[in-house]
Amino acid sequence: MSKKSNKNLAFSLLGLIISMVLLSFASVPIYNLFCKVTGYGGTTAKETVSVYSKVKGTKPIIIEFDANVDKDLPWRFIPRQQRVQIVPGQNTLVFYETENLSDNDIIGTSVYNVTPNKAGKYFVKIHCFCFEEQLLKAGERVLMPVTFYIDKDFELDPEMQDIKVLTLSYSFFKVREMSSLRGNYVSN
């Protein structure tokens, strides 16, 4: 092989590596955009401006609430209400209660899902605590609000006619903990 061939091969491999790294960083935002647009996997819509729906539907829907905690996170996490009955377009405020059961300050973060998945695109969150780091001091208990509504178009979609119950499920995961004695962050 000539020096020119080796140089071309090296540049090609370097370009391939750089492209793969860039694609790996771009894949999460691209996937999130895909899920928002299509409602894939129960991804909900998120209201970017606090504009409340003025038009209300007529078909009652039951919203059930679920809470899960990763085994590595010593928190108690429960919905304050097990379920509510609403109509599309009705703004609703519910709370989840979270308590740090450990002797250390801990930062956690949550993800959510709406089931059945096909209805996720009609579940509009106005405010929630998901995807934001939450610091709970040792023994601290907090209420975390979620404000949402079901888009009025839910009633018009023939695929939603059989749905009477939606479930909003949150799962909390440990990000890191801060040792009470040393004040240092301990990574998960």
UniProtKB/Swiss-Prot annotation:
SUPFAM superfamilies in UniProt: Ctag/Cox11 (SSF110111)
Cytoplasmic side: 1-8
A molecular-function term among this protein's GO annotations: copper ion binding
Ranges in the topological domain labelled Periplasmic: 32-188
Membrane-spanning residues: 9-31
Protein keywords: Cell inner membrane, Cell membrane, Copper, Membrane, Signal-anchor, Transmembrane, Transmembrane helix
Signal sequence, renumbered to the chain: none
Membrane topology: Single-pass type II membrane protein
Principal location: membrane
Electron transport as UniProt keyword: no
Subcellular localization, as worded in the UniProt entry: Cell inner membrane
GO cellular component: plasma membrane
Pfam families named in the record: CtaG_Cox11 (PF04442)
NCBIfam families linked to this entry: PRK05089.1
UniProt record similarity statement: Belongs to the COX11/CtaG family.
Record-given protein name: Cytochrome c oxidase assembly protein CtaG
Organism: Rickettsia conorii (strain ATCC VR-613 / Malish 7)
